[in-house]
Structure formats: structure tokens, C-alpha cells
UniProtKB/Swiss-Prot annotation:
Keywords: Cytoplasm, Initiation factor, Metal-binding, Phosphoprotein, Protein biosynthesis, Zinc, Zinc-finger. Belongs to the eIF-2-beta/eIF-5 family. PANTHER family: EUKARYOTIC TRANSLATION INITIATION FACTOR (PTHR23001), EUKARYOTIC TRANSLATION INITIATION FACTOR 2 SUBUNIT 2 (PTHR23001:SF3). This is Probable eukaryotic translation initiation factor 2 subunit beta. The modification Phosphoserine is found at S45, S137, S138. The modification Phosphothreonine is found at T139.
Length: 321
């Protein structure tokens, strides 16, 4: 009969647990003890080791045979319940932001909430400055009204300063100076006189175009009728003739706009002066070259001869047999 069986018999008979034996404490072996052990030999050390193994086996057997009470079971449950995984509770974004703000303020770190863009407030207008601007604008309007009144009165032929003892205004004197200059010396006023001619009267007769007032236009330009007709035929690319009532009959159908454009080119090239833009010029021919002399400025320049360009086919083509 082994020792463990004897212990179990004691538990069953008496119903009480046997007293636990205390484990022998291990002592640290110093140099003297090591020498003593070495003197005793390997037999003493092996005997001590076997005694320790037997005591450990007895204590483990006693632990297995001891009954577990309800209190100990509850303690074990509490211990294992604390070992379960805890579910992470989702924190609301608002609470998290509040915590972060508290942490930043307490720890003394930067507060990034102040980095948000703030809406600009409209500046309240200064009433005094606004009133000053109004006064300045009103004075400016008054001066402009005065100048307008003076100019209007002068345009009507009335001089406001003649009927009163007030001081003269600069715009009044300036306007008076220019009016006197224009009346006494019109050529020094700097104004360009517009050169106007009678519009050409053009109408159709079948496949022909009749230019009725060509003689009047040539007299107004101070140019010969033959020279004007020659330029017209060269530009329009056609031919024609003059009837008994000094009307030009042009072969082909042409509109009034086309003849007006041709006359404008003739005036620019053979009538107006290139220096002073005056229409008072004379066209003369010397050694088969045309010269244009200006009566206003006295300049003389040569003019190109009229060249016949493209000739339009008007009549029927002759069939060569």
C-alpha cells in the first residue's frame, strides 16, 4: 500500500483534509558547503535529490485529492470573466473633438480651430467722409454747369461778361479767341474742309448703263471729261460713248455703288494734294507725263498715266471658220 492510497483512505474515513506539509526551503550552497558535498561524494547528493522528488509527488497528489468549494469556483469564474475580450465602443465624433480640444488647451499645443477662414465683416462707411465726397462732387457739378451755361450763351451769340461786372472765366476767353480766329483767318483755324461732289445719277437701259451727270462732276473736280471717261473705262473694264446730251453710255450692267467707288479712287489719285489734302489742284501734261500742282501749298508731283487693265468681253465672240 502506497502513501497516496493511505492519504485517500484517511480523507474518506475522517472527512477532513490532512495537514499540508511545508516544502523544504532550498539553501544556497556556498564554497564551504560545496566542499562538504564534494567530500561526502555523489551518493549523498543523489539521496537528497530522491527525497525532494518524493515530497513533490506527495504534495501534487494531495492537491488533486482536495475538494473545491463554491467560493473558490466563483473566484475562478471572476478571474476568467475578466480575461474576455472587451468590445471597443465607438466614440462619437463630437466627443472626440471635444477631448482633442481639451488636450490641446491643457498641454499648451497649437489650437488648429483658429486656422479656419473667418468671414470678412463689411466695413461700416464713415458718414463724415461720405458727406465730404458729396460736397466735392456738388461743387464740381456746379462748375461744370457754369461752363456749360457760358458755352451755351456764346453759341447763341450772347457774351455774358458784357452785361455784368464779374470776372472772366478761362473757357469763355478761350472760346472767344477761337471764334475770332476762325472768322478772321479760316485757313489758319486748322479745320479740314470736306470735299463733296454730286452723287452720280445712274440708270439702266437694257444691257447698257447710262451715266447722266458726268459732265457736272468733271467740272466740279476741275478735270477734263475725256480724262474722267478714260479712267472709268479702265477701272470698269468696258467701253462706251457720249451721246448728244453729254451723257455717258457704258456697255454692260453696273450699279451706282460701283461707279461711286471708281470716282473716289479718281479723286484720291488725280484730284487731292498728298501734302495738304486740298482739292484745289490743277492737272497738266508735260512731255507725255502728267503733273499735279496744288494751289494751296504750291507742291508739285507727278501722276501715273491711266493704264487699261482687264477688258470685259461684252459683245458676241466672232466664230473663226
Amino acid at each position: 500500500m502506497t502513501e497516496t492510497e493511505a492519504v485517500v483512505d484517511q480523507i474518506d474515513l475522517n472527512g477532513a483534509l490532512p495537514e499540508k506539509k511545508k516544502k523544504p526551503k532550498k539553501s544556497v550552497a556556498f564554497d564551504d558547503e560545496v566542499d562538504a558535498v564534494s567530500k561526502d561524494g555523489p551518493e549523498a547528493s543523489s539521496a537528497g535529490a530522491t527525497d525532494e522528488d518524493d515530497s513533490e509527488r506527495k504534495s501534487s497528489a494531495k492537491d488533486l485529492t482536495t475538494p473545491v468549494t463554491e467560493g473558490e469556483v466563483d473566484e475562478l469564474k471572476d478571474m476568467f470573466s475578466s480575461m474576455k475580450k472587451k468590445k471597443k465602443s465607438k466614440k462619437s465624433s463630437a466627443s472626440a473633438e471635444e477631448q482633442t480640444e481639451d488636450i490641446t488647451t491643457e498641454s499648451g499645443e497649437l489650437d488648429f480651430s483658429s486656422m479656419k477662414k473667418k468671414k470678412k465683416k463689411k466695413k461700416s462707411a464713415d458718414l463724415s467722409a461720405f458727406e465730404k465726397e458729396l460736397e466735392a462732387s456738388s461743387t464740381g457739378d456746379a462748375t461744370s454747369d457754369l461752363s456749360k451755361q457760358t458755352f451755351d450763351s456764346e453759341n447763341m451769340g450772347e457774351h455774358a461778361w458784357l452785361k455784368s461786372d464779374r470776372d472772366y472765366y478761362y473757357p469763355e476767353l478761350l472760346n472767344r479767341f477761337f471764334t475770332l480766329l476762325r472768322t478772321n483767318n479760316p485757313e489758319l483755324a486748322g479745320e479740314k474742309r470736306k470735299y463733296t461732289i454730286v452723287p452720280p445719277s445712274v440708270h439702266r437701259e437694257g444691257k447698257k448703263t447710262i451715266f447722266a451727270n458726268i459732265s457736272d462732276i468733271s467740272k466740279r473736280m476741275h478735270r477734263s471729261l475725256d480724262h474722267v471717261i478714260q479712267f472709268l473705262f479702265a477701272e470698269l473694264g468696258t467701253s462706251g460713248s457720249v451721246d448728244g446730251s453729254s451723257r455717258l453710255i457704258i456697255k454692260g450692267r453696273f450699279q451706282q455703288k460701283q461707279i461711286e467707288n471708281v470716282l473716289r479712287r479718281y479723286i484720291v489719285e488725280y484730284v487731292t494734294c498728298k501734302t495738304c489734302k486740298s482739292p484745289d489742284t490743277i492737272l497738266t501734261k508735260e512731255n507725255r507725263i502728267f503733273f499735279m500742282t496744288c494751289e494751296a501749298c504750291g507742291s508739285v508731283r507727278s501722276v501715273q498715266a491711266i493704264k487699261t487693265g482687264y477688258q470685259a468681253q461684252i459683245g458676241k465672240r466672232k466664230h473663226v471658220s
